[in-house]
């Protein structure tokens, strides 16, 4: 019996998501490239991982030009396949391989698109919770899209208690690092502030190697928070009165001299209740003259077009 998977040939492994392996594949009928996320089903008792169910249910109803599109979901044998649109690479690889491509115009275009997508998610009561360069996909036409919704979740008002083991360390908001279980859209905005800074500086803003090191890197730059600049911070579970008292330093020079300095600081505001929203960020003066870049010279994919590398998918 043939299945939809018989229509695809696998070209190469291109990464690993929150769960499962991601392959580039090609449609036999159209020649279109797609991204296939393969998730192994461990057994009848465990079934489909909750992360996969969450991503499928959220993306099925989340249609936006800057959110990666989920085309189909197929179960074959002991594997579940999610068929996504294919984009050339993620933002992390682009920053690593071709730093000179990040002109002020491209950074502005990318941030405008990302904020538009994140604002759309928030309007639809969805937190991404794992925004980082690896989960932002780019193509040669200047598009950037949110991907990997494996840690995303719908949220309600009033707030519910959520796990704080979310968001990759370098992009994790201080309220999560300090143990709060009540958080909202501000955690995504903090992550975007870090990503924004990284595109400008060509390096991570807060590259911590542990939770305490991450906190201290933030404190050294932005000052140790207290009740004056973040009401309620001393009541958070992991706040310590013995934290070193740093007065803060200026942000790195590429940020302080950048036209987006004010916007970045409003995204990195300590108090999550005062942190700028995605909707308001899009109205900031920084974006007044935004023009979307329609061509980006991405690094050449050495495997692109290599028919000899294609193999049967199943």
UniProtKB/Swiss-Prot annotation:
UniProt xrefs under PROSITE patterns: PROTEIN_KINASE_ATP, PROTEIN_KINASE_DOM, PROTEIN_KINASE_ST
EC nos: 2.7.11.22, 2.7.11.23
A GO biological process held by the record: G2/M transition of mitotic cell cycle
Record-linked InterPro entries: CDK, Kinase-like_dom_sf, Prot_kinase_dom, Protein_kinase_ATP_BS, Ser/Thr_kinase_AS
PTM-bearing positions, type Phosphotyrosine: 19, 162
Binding site for ATP: 14-22, 37
Location of Phosphothreonine modifications: 18, 163
SUPFAM superfamilies referenced in this protein's UniProt entry, alphabetically: Protein kinase-like (PK-like) (SSF56112)
Reactions catalysed according to its record: L-seryl-[protein] + ATP = O-phospho-L-seryl-[protein] + ADP + H(+); L-threonyl-[protein] + ATP = O-phospho-L-threonyl-[protein] + ADP + H(+); [DNA-directed RNA polymerase] + ATP = phospho-[DNA-directed RNA polymerase] + ADP + H(+)
Keywords, comma-separated and alphabetical: ATP-binding, Cell cycle, Cell division, Kinase, Mitosis, Nucleotide-binding, Phosphoprotein, Serine/threonine-protein kinase, Transferase
MF (Gene Ontology): ATP binding; cyclin binding; cyclin-dependent protein serine/threonine kinase activity; protein serine kinase activity; RNA polymerase II CTD heptapeptide repeat kinase activity
Keyword Lipoprotein set for record: no
EC category: transferase
Domain named Protein kinase: residues: 8-287
A single Gene Ontology CC term: nucleus
Record: active site: 130 (proton acceptor)
Entry-linked Pfam families: Pkinase (PF00069)
Function of the protein: Like Cdk1, could play a key role in the control of the eukaryotic cell cycle.
Family as reported in the entry's similarity comment: Belongs to the protein kinase superfamily. CMGC Ser/Thr protein kinase family. CDC2/CDKX subfamily.
Subunit structure: Interacts with cyclin CycG.
Protein's name in the database: Cyclin-dependent kinase 2
């Amino acid at each position: 019996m043939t299945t939809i998977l018989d229509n695809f040939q696998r070209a190469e492994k291109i990464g690993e998501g929150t769960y499962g392996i991601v392959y580039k594949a090609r449609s036999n009928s159209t020649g279109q490239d797609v991204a296939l996320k393969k998730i192994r089903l461990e057994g009848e008792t465990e079934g489909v991982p909750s992360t996969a169910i969450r991503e499928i249910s959220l993306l099925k109803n989340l249609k936006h030009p800057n959110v990666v599109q989920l085309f189909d979901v197929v179960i074959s044998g002991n594997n579940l396949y999610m068929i996504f649109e294919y984009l050339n690479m993620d933002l992390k690889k682009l920053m690593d391989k071709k730093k000179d491509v990040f002109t002020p115009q491209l950074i502005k275009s990318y941030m405008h698109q990302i904020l538009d997508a994140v604002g759309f998610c928030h309007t639809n009561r969805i937190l991404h919770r794992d925004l980082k360069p690896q989960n932002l996909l780019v193509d040669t036409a200047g598009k950037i899209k949110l991907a990997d919704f494996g840690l995303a979740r719908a949220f309600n008002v009033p707030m519910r208690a959520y796990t704080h083991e979310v968001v990759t360390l370098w992009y994790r908001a201080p309220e999560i690092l300090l143990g709060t279980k009540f958080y909202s859209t501000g955690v995504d905005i903090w992550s975007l502030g870090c990503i924004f800074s990284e595109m400008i500086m060509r390096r991570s803003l807060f590259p911590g190697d542990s939770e305490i090191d991450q906190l201290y890197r933030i404190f050294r730059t932005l000052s140790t928070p207290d009740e004056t600049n973040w009401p309620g911070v001393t009541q958070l579970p992991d706040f310590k009165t013995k934290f070193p008292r740093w007065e803060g330093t200026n942000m790195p020079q590429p940020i302080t001299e950048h036209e987006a300095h004010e916007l970045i600081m409003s995204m990195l505001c300590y108090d999550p209740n005062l942190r700028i929203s995605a909707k308001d960020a899009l109205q900031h003066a920084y974006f007044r003259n935004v023009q979307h870049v329609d061509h980006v010279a991405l690094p050449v994919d050495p495997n692109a077009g290599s028919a000899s590398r294609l193999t049967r998918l199943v």
